[in-house]
Amino acid sequence: MYDPTAWKTRRYERTKRRVSTGELPRLVGFRIWSWVSTGRMCDGCGEVVGAAEIQHDVDVDGTIVLRLHPECFRAWYVVER
């Protein structure tokens, strides 16, 4: 059966796995900024955040350290906690 949201699930699982294995940092004292995509690669799943998508920037002390799709941010945040 076709699942129209399967790509979001794949992104989520890929990001969750990368946090669990230490490929993505665990951060303390971060802020989140949400924007329309800048067309850069998502640090979570490795796919480009498309022009029509929202991009979450994770900021630590004024430096953007992660750029993530919304579903990738959720995966990172769940494992981070």
Spell out what each predicted region is.
Residues L27-R40:
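Short, flexible, mixed-charge glycine/proline-rich loop motifs
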Residues G22-G29, D59, A75-E80:
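Non-catalytic localization and substrate-recognition regions of ubiquitin/SUMO ligases
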